[in-house]
Amino acid sequence: MQQSIWVNGLNRKIKLQIRKMNLKKKLFILVFILLNIYGLLCGVIYFFQENLIFMPSVLSQEHVFEMKSSFDEINLKSSDGAHLNGLYFKKENSKGVVLYFHGNAGNLKDWGQIADLFVDLDYDVLIMDYRGYGKSKGEKSMEFLYEDAELWYEFVQQNYSESKIIVYGRSIGTTFAAYVAAKHGPNKLILEAPFYSMLAIAKSRFSFLPIRYLLDYKFPTYQFMDDINCPVIFYHGTYDKVIPYDQGKKLYDSFNTDKKELITIPMGGHNNLNSFKEYTESIRLEL
C-alpha cells in the first residue's frame, strides 16, 4: 500500500515537471516568435522605407505632357549626374513665380494641373518631379533630394529677383520648400500639410520600434525654420489622415517669429484643401 502511494506521488511529480517543462518550452517558442516578428518589422521599415515614403509614377522620356496652361519642359542635371525634369509655366506680365514642390505620389502628368491656380492669379510656375518620378532619374537619398531642391531654386533665381519668388511646398514637398527658403530669401513661403519631421511621423505610427536607428529619410523640417526670414503661411486640415494636423501645428509652434500664419481648415483632409473656401480665399489674398 505504501509502495503504491509512493509510486503515485512520484508519477504526480513527474507529470508536474513535464507540465513545467512544456510551459517553459511554450513560453520560449512564444518569445522566439515575437522576437522574429519584431525583427521582421524592423527589417521591413529599414529595407522598404523608400517604398513606404515615396510612391512615384514613372513616365517614358518620350511622354508628351498636355496641360491647360502653356509651358516649357525643363531638364536639369544634378551634381551626381541625375536627370531632373520639370514644367515651367509662363504668364505674360506675371507678378512673379511660384516654385512648387509637390507631394509624395504621382508625377507631373497629374501635378502639372496645379499650375492653373497660380497662372490664373498671374504667376509663372515651376514644378518639378523628384528623382524616380515621371521623367526624372537618379539614385535617391535625403541629401540628394535637398540638393535637387536647391538646384531648382537656383534655376528660378537666374530669371527672377528673390522679391518675386514664392516657394510653395505640399506634403513631403514642404520639407524641400522650407530648406530652400532657409538658405535664401524668397518673398514668401507657403506650406500645405507640413510636418515637423518624418521621424516624428514614423515614431507616432511605430512607437514600439527603434525608428530613430532605422529611418534614413528623417526629413527634419523643424531644423530649417529658425533660418527662414520671409513670411510663412501654413495650411492644414483637421481631418488629415496622412500628415496629422498636430504635425503641422507642432511645426508652426516651433517657428519663433511674428511673420507666420496658420490657416486651419476644419474638416479638411490631405488632398482636398483646394475645395475649401478658407483655402482658396486665403491663397488669393496671399498672392
Could you tell me what each predicted segment is?
Residues 239-243, 270-271:
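Acidic catalytic loop of the alpha/beta-hydrolase fold
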Residues 228, 234-236, 240:
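Short beta-strand/loop motif that positions the catalytic acidic residue
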Residues 197-230:
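Mobile cap/lid helix-loop segments that gate and shape the active-site cleft of serine hydrolases
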Residues 114, 221, 230, 244-253:
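Short alpha-helix in the alpha/beta-hydrolase fold that links the catalytic acid
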Residues 250, 254-287:
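C-terminal catalytic histidine-bearing segment of alpha/beta-hydrolase fold enzymes
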Residues 79-156, 170, 174-175:
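Membrane-embedded segments
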Residues 26, 30, 35-77:
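An N-terminal hydrophobic leader/cap segment in hydrolases
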Residues 154-158, 162-208:
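Primarily recognizes the serine-hydrolase "nucleophile elbow" in alpha/beta-hydrolase
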